[in-house]
Curated annotation (Swiss-Prot):
Protein name: Uncharacterized protein 226R
Domain of life the protein comes from: Viruses
Amino acid sequence: MLNMDCLIKTIEMEEIYKYICEISIKLGIKKENLIKLWCDEQKIYESVFDEYLALKYVSCSSCHKMQLVSDEFNFHCTFCPHYNGYAQCTFSCCYN
């Protein structure tokens, strides 16, 4: 059985992490520093963000909406049917 409290907290943490990523991009501050500040303020352990730190916050090349992905060069957009992958890359590093 699914624990709804746990699911709600996971969704909230993901939204908070997305917000931290946006602030990091706009202000040019490392997201790790923002996470530390937020966790200190909320009096929680930084480890709550461990599972998100490996994710990248990137935009789809088609709809340009931001999303969390594990591989910024190989993902399906969650907002449109577009695939962002190595096949579309024009840099030689993707073909070697």
